[in-house]
């Protein structure tokens, strides 16, 4: 909600406008009333209720969400809270069928979490210090809440970063769906999309289910099925061959702190993020949970070599990581104590940025998250952008369709998708580019620039 413009601001603007009219020059910018959080929903768009609203099939389109990762489940939750009918299709047989990655850091998406009905994340860990070292342990940069408090700096951080296991966040979102009155109809496990085509009634989807082909109908299809999106391939013809290799490999692992009981280091206090680099290899270590840390080692490597190393499996990846990181404590100890079963590695890819024109002719189908704008992991933005995409799309569906039955005549692309895609692509484009740039400068001498700020900021 907007507050009233203060009298002092009005008078200042009127004086500046009078001066402009009399003497010319640059016209003053008209002041805008400041925004304040709604007292009913506190800025989340939600109010507490015993049950979610019933799905409104008269006002809203039936949404088919392809992919049960963080972005897809977040969209399902956002639809549930707004009475938008949806079905979530996931190819895995159940929640635990395969690993859903390691840890992630909620940055600007922390507010989006509240907009998805999650008041707190019990498994989340807040970091208050970020340290950058060279390989002998010399600190070349440090920032975060504790840094500013220790130095009595006058500026405080605008937000904190919350670290959480990807599966923990995904589970917290899925638990929101438990309130659905027909959960078994709303979430379809074991459904792999094999085809879709537009019909006069909407979109017909075909799924491979336990060796059979089953069909379903929807008004709107949302591809939230990751970097190798089946939806994207079907509507744009862009498969894995159109991925863009970023000339490096990432090896990840999770180490329980109990395996480091004989290691004394303030870097292992579950509230510190640290990274160490030499201008070629770079390791990043962050809290994974209260009792474990996650590490990510990355370095340049030819694509064929990276694919071969990844294919060799966890033991080979761990051995490669240990061999490359005989640096300051506790890095060698962390990697040595990491169970091989908790190590994985992959070549790092993204895709060229999509344009709105590329999506203009695909009808009532859209993409979000990695399906729309995959990016390198080096800025920690993938999950954040997927959450923002999901909340944005649900809100625009409400705005474009509620009390406006004309969406059936005008079409969802004009009524909803053009606005959503323009906002999503503009917001995520800078993140994709920054993440690609980071894949380069984090493996160069730039990462060792002495300054108390995130790496790469000195380039801007």
Locations of regions flagged by a protein language model:
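Active-site-adjacent segment of FAD-dependent monooxygenases/related oxidoreductases
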Residues: 94-176
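Conserved FAD-binding catalytic core of PHBH/FMO-like flavoproteins
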Residues: 139, 159, 171-340
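C-terminal helical "tail/cap" subdomain of flavin- and related membrane-associated enzymes
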Residues: 2-40, 49-57, 129, 334, ...
């Amino acid at each position: 909600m907007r507050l009233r413009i203060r009298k002092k601001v009005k008078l200042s603007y009127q004086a500046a406008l009078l001066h402009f009219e009399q003497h010319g020059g640059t016209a003053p910018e008209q002041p805008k009333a400041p925004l304040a959080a709604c007292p009913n929903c506190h800025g989340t768009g939600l109010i507490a209720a015993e049950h979610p609203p019933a799905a409104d099939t008269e006002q809203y389109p039936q949404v088919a969400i392809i992919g049960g990762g963080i972005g897809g489940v977040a969209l399902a939750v956002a639809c549930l809270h707004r009475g938008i009918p949806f079905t979530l299709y996931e190819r895995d047989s159940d929640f635990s069928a395969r690993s859903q990655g390691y840890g992630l850091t909620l940055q600007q998406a922390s507010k989006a979490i509240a907009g998805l009905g999650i008041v707190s994340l019990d498994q989340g860990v807040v970091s208050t210090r970020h340290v950058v070292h060279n390989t002998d342990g010399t600190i070349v940069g440090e920032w975060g809440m504790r840094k500013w408090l220790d130095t009595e700096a006058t500026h405080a951080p605008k937000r904190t970063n919350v670290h959480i296991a990807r599966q923990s966040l995904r589970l917290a979102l899925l638990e929101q769906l438990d309130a659905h009155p027909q959960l078994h109809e709303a979430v379809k496990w074991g459904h792999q999309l094999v085809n879709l085509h537009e019909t006069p009634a909407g979109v017909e989807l075909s799924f491979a289910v336990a060796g059979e082909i089953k069909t379903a109908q929807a008004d709107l299809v949302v591809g939230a099925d990751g970097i190798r999106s089946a939806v994207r391939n079907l509507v744009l013809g862009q498969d894995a061959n159109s991925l863009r290799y970023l000339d490096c490999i990432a090896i990840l692992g999770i180490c329980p702190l109990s395996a480091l009981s004989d290691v004394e280091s303030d870097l292992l206090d579950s509230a510190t993020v640290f990274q160490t680099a030499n201008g070629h290899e770079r390791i990043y270590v962050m809290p994974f949970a209260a009792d474990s840390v996650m590490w990510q080692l990355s370095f340049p490597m030819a694509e064929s070599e990276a694919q071969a190393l990844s294919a060799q499996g966890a033991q080979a990846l761990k051995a490669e990581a240990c061999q490359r990181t005989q640096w300051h404590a506790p890095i060698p100890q962390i990697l040595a104590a990491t169970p091989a079963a908790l190590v994985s590695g992959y070549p790092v890819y993204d895709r060229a940025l999509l344009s709105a024109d590329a999506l203009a002719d695909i009808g009532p189908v859209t993409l979000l998250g990695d399906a729309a704008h995959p990016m390198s992991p080096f800025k920690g933005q993938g999950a954040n952008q997927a959450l923002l995409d999901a909340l944005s799309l649900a809100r625009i569906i409400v705005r474009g369709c509620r009390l406006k039955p004309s969406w059936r005549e005008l079409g969802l692309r004009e009524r909803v998708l053009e606005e959503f895609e323009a906002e999503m692509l503009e917001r995520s484009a800078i993140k994709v580019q920054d993440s690609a740039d980071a894949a380069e400068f984090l493996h160069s001498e730039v990462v060792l620039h002495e300054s108390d700020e995130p790496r790469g900021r000195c380039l801007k």
